[in-house]
């Protein structure tokens, strides 16, 4: 039985004292990052070489002796910052990303690593223990093993989001289930009018566009109105070419961040519900298109709607959930004419445009909804 890692995101509720300690860890991680970036650049200018991860960790002893406040921070957090610098440079050497830069207090992501072995749920109190921080209240719907050394974590990290909430992210091993699959294949067509149109055997399943729901429309309206208020306040506080950010503007921007986070949460939760429902049907295989989302985004009339649909997230969730349940996942080439091919006779209607919602076969006269037609062709696709 294969093994994979499952990622978790858990909300934390620290006290004021614990929150100050966590902010101190964030400052320390950023301080070490910037210091190591500076040392890497100086080393390169000297002899064109690179400081390895282990050499950076060895430097921590002398750095801590010069900065005594770092003794209040977990040593694993400091080592994690060195590891992050090394990872960033390795990705730069492979030409995956740009060269690592200094982190700003205002613009950088507020996060730090925590030691996996010392992160566990206490038996008596049921609180989450974090080294150098203490026992923290948390909220989750998942059940975890209780006791020291029971939670075998990987890549554990604390993050303070812009919405003002604390979370811990980590991964745990899980055994992929060898589920008993049905003999029905599944074809999934993604779209803007409907989020997903699914062909499953002789069944048709449609997941409506969550962005057209009343809840999302009202939330987007609140965001638009708040953006107008903030824009007018900036104009009212303009001095020459400079804009003065007042306390009221900061409060409104924090409120706007929380609304965006809520909207994003609604969309992602809906995708999780849809993908879970499809995977629970246990099809013998799942077939989807390999969409060119970047190319589709170039259409100025559809780019916003495509962005709101989160196509990449839908495909990503279907991939890993299929892997967990032992379901073969197939992605068809993006140039496969799933919408233009007649599901009855196989003829291709090359004149079909985006505005045509009904497919009419030029050969046999077969009429069908174009999205369901695409889902049927994907379901019947053979590698």
Write out the residue ranges for each language-model feature.
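Gly/serine-rich nucleotide phosphate-binding loop at the start of the catalytic core
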Residues: 1-80
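Positively charged, helix-rich recognition surfaces that bind polyanionic ligands
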Residues: 6, 149, 162-383
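Short, surface-exposed charged micro-motifs
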Residues: 11, 118-120, 157-158, 187, ...
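Non-catalytic, well-ordered alpha-helical scaffold segments
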Residues: 20-23, 27-30, 76-83, 272, ...
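Alpha-helical coiled-coil heptad-repeat segments used for dimerization/assembly
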Residues: 24, 31, 42, 80-83, ...
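A generic secondary-structure signal for well-formed alpha-helical elements
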Residues: 33-40, 44, 89-96, 194, ...
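Stable alpha-helical structural segments in soluble proteins, enriched in small hydrophobic residues
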Residues: 36, 77, 81-92, 372-383
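Acidic carboxylate diad motif detector
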Residues: 54-161, 308
């Amino acid at each position: 039985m294969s093994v994979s890692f499952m990622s978790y995101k858990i909300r934390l509720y620290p006290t004021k004292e614990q929150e100050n300690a966590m902010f101190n860890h964030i400052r320390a991680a950023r301080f070490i990052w910037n210091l190591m970036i500076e040392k890497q650049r100086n080393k390169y200018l000297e002899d064109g070489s690179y400081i390895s991860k282990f050499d950076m960790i060895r430097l921590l002893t002398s750095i801590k002796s010069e900065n005594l406040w770092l003794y209040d921070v977990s040593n694993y957090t400091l080592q994690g910052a060195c590891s992050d610098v090394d990872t960033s440079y390795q990705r730069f050497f492979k030409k995956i990303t740009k060269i690592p830069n200094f982190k700003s207090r205002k613009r950088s992501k507020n996060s730090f690593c925590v030691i996996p072995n010392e992160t566990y749920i206490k038996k008596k109190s049921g609180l989450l223990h974090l080294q150098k921080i203490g026992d923290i209240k948390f909220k989750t719907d998942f059940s975890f093993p209780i006791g020291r050394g029971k939670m075998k974590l990987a890549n554990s990290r604390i993050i303070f989001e812009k919405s003002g909430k604390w979370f811990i992210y980590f991964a745990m091993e899980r055994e992929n289930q060898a589920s008993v699959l049905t003999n029905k294949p599944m074809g999934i067509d993604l779209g803007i009018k409907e989020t997903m149109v699914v062909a499953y055997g002789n069944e048709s399943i449609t997941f409506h566009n969550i962005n057209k729901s009343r809840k999302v429309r009202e939330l987007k309206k609140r965001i638009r109105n708040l953006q107008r208020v903030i824009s007018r306040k900036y104009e009212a506080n303009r001095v020459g070419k400079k804009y003065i950010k007042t306390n009221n503007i900061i409060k409104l921007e924090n409120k706007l961040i929380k609304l965006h986070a809520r909207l994003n949460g609604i969309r992602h939760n809906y995708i999780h519900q849809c993908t879970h429902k499809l995977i629970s049907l246990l099809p013998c295989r799942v077939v989807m298109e390999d969409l060119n989302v970047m190319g589709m985004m170039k259409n100025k009339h559809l780019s916003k709607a495509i962005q709101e649909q989160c196509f990449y997230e839908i495909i990503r969730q279907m991939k890993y959930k299929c892997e967990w349940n032992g379901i073969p996942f197939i992605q068809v080439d993006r140039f496969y004419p799933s919408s233009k091919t007649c599901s009855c006779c196989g003829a291709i209607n090359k004149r079909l445009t985006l505005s045509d919602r009904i497919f009419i076969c030029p050969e046999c006269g077969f009429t069908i909804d174009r999205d369901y037609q695409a889902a049927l062709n994907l379901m019947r696709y053979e590698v």
